[in-house]
């Protein structure tokens, strides 16, 4: 569908990553169109009725995002007025902070660091930071400061619950810390980890919050590097099937 090609060429020439950025912007439009359509004409179709009961509940629409969906949740919730509550699994903010710390980056680094692209680690780090401006239109960091009051009727207020897994090798826990501080949401008192600078609140809570689960998975590197691939699906994926986390969501 063009995404892989856009990223491949972008690793050799970051100007091409604009195409990937545009696809992220299009995804918000696609979600808006989907929600509007399902709430509207689709919900009235005979196929969505059973025993004269409409099977589509259009009164309460919420968002649940996992991984990239967790990263992009704040932009969706802020820009689409039909949804104002979301659960964001293993997400965070600042894609340029996440990239080099992610095992997902491993598959791209071989080309990015090749003689066809940028052999210098320093050059690659600088370019990733510069690329952030291309991602800002759908970046959580752009929308999290307006979580409570919105902005001028263009950005809408919303509530979120971040569910984070310690030692996540795909989406670094550091980016969840950053997202929570940017938004000013509290951390639940029974969370296994309390990020610096956050208010601590007791559950149940009315409004937004963040909670961290610790499955005692292997520690990821503390530096600006990704962990080994055998860590790839541990903390990131297994929290999704952990009953207390699912119940909380």
What is each stretch, according to the model?
Residues 28, 32-35, 39, 61-62, ...:
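Generic hydrophobic alpha-helical scaffold/packing signal
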Residues 13-15, 53, 60, 106:
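A signal for specific C-terminal beta-sheet/loop modules enriched in small/flexible residues
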Residues 1, 60-68, 141-149:
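Amphipathic repeat-derived elements
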Residues 1-41, 46-48:
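Cap/lid segment of the alpha/beta-hydrolase catalytic domain
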Residues 15, 19-26, 82-249:
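C-terminal subdomain of alpha/beta-hydrolase-fold enzymes, centered on the catalytic histidine
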Residues 30, 69-72, 175:
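General structural feature for long, well-ordered alpha-helical segments within catalytic domains
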Residues 37, 43-100:
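Primarily recognizes the serine-hydrolase "nucleophile elbow" in alpha/beta-hydrolase
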């Amino acid at each position: 569908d063009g995404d892989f090609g856009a990223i491949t060429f972008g690793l050799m020439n970051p100007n091409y990553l604009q195409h990937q950025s545009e696809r992220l912007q299009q995804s918000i439009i696609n979600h808006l169109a989907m929600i509007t359509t399902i709430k509207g004409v689709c919900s009235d179709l005979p196929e969505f009725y059973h025993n004269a009961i409409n099977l589509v509940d259009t009164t309460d629409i919420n968002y649940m995002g996992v991984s990239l969906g967790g990263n992009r949740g704040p932009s969706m919730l802020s820009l689409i007025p039909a949804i104002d509550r979301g659960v964001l699994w293993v997400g965070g903010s600042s894609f340029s902070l996440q990239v080099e710390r992610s095992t997902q980056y491993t598959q791209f680094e071989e080309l990015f660091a090749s003689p066809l692209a940028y052999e210098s680690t320093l050059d690659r780090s600088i370019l990733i930071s510069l690329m952030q401006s291309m991602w800002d239109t759908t970046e959580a960091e752009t929308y999290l400061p307006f979580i409570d009051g919105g902005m001028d009727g263009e950005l809408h207020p919303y509530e979120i619950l971040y569910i984070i897994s310690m030692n996540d090798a795909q989406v670094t826990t550091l980016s969840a810390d950053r997202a929570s501080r940017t938004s000013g949401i509290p951390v639940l008192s029974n969370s296994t980890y309390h990020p610096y600078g956050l208010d601590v609140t007791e559950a149940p809570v009315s409004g937004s919050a963040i909670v961290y689960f610790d499955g005692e998975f292997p520690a990821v590197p503390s530096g600006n590097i990704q962990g080994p691939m055998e860590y790839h699906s541990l903390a990131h994926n297994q929290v999704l099937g952990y009953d207390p986390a699912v119940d909380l969501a």
